[in-house]
């Protein structure tokens, strides 16, 4: 005899589904939820439909099926509107649940829908749903989520961003993310924070040691990041060193310290490099700014080390943008540009507001002699973060395109943000040095920058290149030698070798190329320089040799693009005379 199924108890099934979701048993919840939502509507009340679709959406969200969960959250919201928000629907009063707070449930659904849109990179739609929740009805999570989205958008929403972060602090005075973000924006956090702390401690009925909130240690850290946002790395560095003296193995502090050294006027790449290595020793799977570290590894042509970092990041953080920009750098070093672009696009798809990914994409496209294609990426990077690194690449692109006015605007913008910063002065000098009629002014600015910081690598390289262009050969050598005495690097030896090569001092050039390779045997610019020098010493014109190779490649591929390549190469040659 075939056993009959018992009567379906929808309310009990929904209760079981809620237990599974709250226990984070999402696979089991999806399995049960499929049965709940498939019960015919005649056997369910509209209220039960609202709850079951919402819980089913929760189970799918927990399984990272964001597009599917979005569908069911919206379905739940649609039914909610039909039942509770339709004033003409008087016949359905029996379908309403008296003790059900439909407005609060509506806001919770809108928040869940916004999270789905964030996960699938539809941030504008996410913001529209969050903004439809009345301000007074927004909870801590809603305020924090919308503040993050406003922050990603940038200046256009800065006022709303500040208001949202302040509401977060009112609700939770220990939200360090909100405190840091507000201080980075230059806001007086204490006006909100102190009353919020007092209210919190009074609410908890005592001032005993378990309830006292201590944020005295965060002030210096927040201020250091504010100085970084203002392009004042020296001030940031001083503050971070004080924090680091108390928390010497704090990974976040070490990361910010490494970045401060990177942006600093003095040649601090070695300090940056060493701090990142310390972070890797403490935690090889730490993700913060690891793509910046990988860019330093690429710059030094350290392929094995770069590969190791990429493997660790892919294994531990496959859903982070930094992972895929790091992988893109690895392929860029291997000259696999197609793979490099593929991975940098993957990084952008994960986090569109990651400025380094846009900057790297622009750099890759510039390497392909495609400055017009590179320009939007570099402009987006500069829009997201106005710092010397994003400005330098954008200026370089404008110069290649012979857009002197645009290059000058970018250089002046970054220089106005930090007028006493040698690197920004060097960038402005570089733009002016590209215009023969402005070279005298460029020299004044670069000389002032060098006085401000005698060992700023950007200034030294820019001024030495200007000296070479104007025929001041010995001055170029002297300034580079002075830098070399201060800090011996593979870069500086290679630069000096290049200057000697322009004057046909082959023996001196060879000495410095070899010295660069002694410091770093994998340093690609030095290897290329030696290869070029060896051709010259054999009486072979290396440029003619390269042109011949390009002609052969064009004939093999049947592409008639040689004239354009030559024009692009000419642009790059002019640009390379100034750009460090």
Curated annotation (Swiss-Prot):
Annotated segments matching region Disordered: 539-580
Entry keyword annotation includes Cell cycle: yes
UniProt main location, coarse: nucleus
Gene Ontology, cellular component aspect: nucleus
Domain of life of the source: Eukaryota
Extent of the TPR repeats: 50-83, 107-140, 141-175, 253-286, 321-354, 356-388, 390-421, 422-456, 458-490, 491-523
Gene3D superfamilies, A to Z: Tetratricopeptide repeat domain
Biased composition range(s): Acidic residues: 542-580
SMART domains assigned to the protein according to its UniProt record, in alphabetical order: TPR
Subcellular location(s) per record: Nucleus
Pfam families: TPR_8
Pathway given in the UniProt record: Protein modification; protein ubiquitination
PROSITE patterns xref list: TPR, TPR_REGION
Keyword Chaperone: no
GO biological process, one term: cell division
Keywords: Cell cycle, Cell division, Mitosis, Nucleus, Repeat, TPR repeat, Ubl conjugation pathway
Subunit annotation: The APC/C is composed of at least 13 subunits that stay tightly associated throughout the cell cycle: anapc1, anapc2, anapc3, anapc4, anapc5, anapc6, anapc7, anapc8, anapc10, anapc11, cdc20, cdc26 and cdh1.
Role of this protein: Component of the anaphase promoting complex/cyclosome (APC/C), a cell cycle-regulated E3 ubiquitin-protein ligase complex that controls progression through mitosis and the G1 phase of the cell cycle.
Family that this chain belongs to: Belongs to the APC7 family.
Record-given protein name: Anaphase-promoting complex subunit 7
Lineage of source species: Eukaryota, Amoebozoa, Evosea, Eumycetozoa, Dictyostelia
Gene: anapc7
């Amino acid at each position: 005899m075939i056993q009959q199924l018992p009567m379906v108890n929808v309310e009990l099934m929904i209760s079981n589904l809620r237990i599974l979701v709250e226990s984070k048993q999402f696979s089991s919840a999806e399995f049960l939820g499929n049965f709940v939502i498939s019960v015919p509507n005649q056997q369910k009340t509209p209220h039960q439909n609202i709850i079951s679709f919402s819980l089913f959406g929760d189970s799918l969200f927990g399984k990272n099926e964001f597009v599917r969960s979005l569908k069911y959250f919206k379905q739940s919201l649609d039914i909610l509107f039909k039942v509770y928000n339709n004033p003409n629907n008087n016949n359905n009063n029996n379908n309403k649940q008296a003790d059900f707070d439909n407005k609060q449930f509506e806001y919770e659904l809108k928040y869940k829908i916004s999270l789905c849109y964030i996960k699938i990179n539809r941030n504008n739609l996410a913001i529209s749903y969050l903004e439809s929740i009345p301000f007074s009805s927004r909870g801590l999570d809603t305020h924090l989520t919308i503040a993050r989205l406003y922050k990603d958008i940038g200046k256009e929403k800065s006022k709303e961003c500040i208001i949202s972060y302040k509401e977060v602090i009112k609700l939770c005075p220990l939200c360090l993310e909100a405190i840091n973000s507000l201080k980075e924006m230059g806001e007086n956090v204490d006006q909100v924070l102190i009353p919020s702390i007092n209210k919190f401690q009074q609410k908890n009925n005592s001032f005993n040691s378990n309830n006292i909130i201590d944020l005295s240690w965060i002030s210096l850290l927040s201020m250091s990041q504010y100085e970084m946002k203002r392009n004042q790395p020296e001030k940031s560095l001083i503050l971070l060193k004080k924090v680091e003296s108390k928390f010497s193995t704090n990974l976040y502090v070490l990361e910010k310290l490494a970045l401060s050294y990177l942006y600093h006027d003095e040649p601090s790449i070695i300090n940056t490099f060493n701090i990142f290595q310390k972070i890797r020793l403490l935690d090889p799977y730490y993700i913060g700014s690891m793509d910046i570290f990988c860019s330093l590894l690429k710059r030094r042509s350290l392929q094995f080390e770069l590969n190791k970092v990429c493997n660790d990041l892919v294994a531990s953080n496959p859903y982070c943008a930094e992972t895929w920009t790091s992988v893109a750098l690895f392929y860029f070093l291997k000259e696999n540009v197609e793979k490099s672009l593929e991975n940098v696009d993957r990084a952008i798809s994960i986090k569109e507001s990651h400025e380094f990914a846009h900057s790297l994409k622009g750099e890759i496209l510039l390497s392909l002699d495609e400055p017009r294609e590179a320009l939007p990426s570099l402009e987006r990077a500069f829009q997201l973060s106005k710092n010397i690194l994003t400005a330098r690449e954008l200026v370089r692109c404008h110069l290649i395109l012979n857009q002197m006015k645009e290059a000058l605007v970018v250089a002046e913008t970054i220089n106005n943000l930090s007028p006493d910063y040698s690197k920004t002065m060097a960038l402005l000098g570089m733009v002016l040095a590209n215009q023969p009629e402005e070279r005298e002014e460029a020299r004044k600015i670069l000389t002032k920058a060098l006085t401000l910081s005698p060992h700023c690598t950007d200034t030294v390289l820019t001024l030495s290149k200007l000296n070479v262009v104007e025929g001041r050969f010995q001055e170029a050598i002297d300034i580079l030698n002075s830098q070399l005495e201060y800090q011996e690097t593979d870069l500086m030896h290679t630069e000096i070798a290049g200057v000697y090569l322009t004057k046909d001092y082959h023996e001196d050039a060879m000495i410095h190329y070899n010295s660069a390779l002694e410091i770093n045997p994998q340093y690609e610019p030095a290897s290329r320089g030696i290869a070029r020098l060896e051709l010259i010493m054999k009486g072979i014109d290396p440029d003619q040799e390269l042109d011949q190779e390009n002609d052969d490649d064009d004939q093999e591929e049947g592409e008639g693009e040689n004239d354009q390549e030559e024009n692009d190469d000419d642009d790059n040659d002019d640009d390379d005379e100034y750009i460090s």
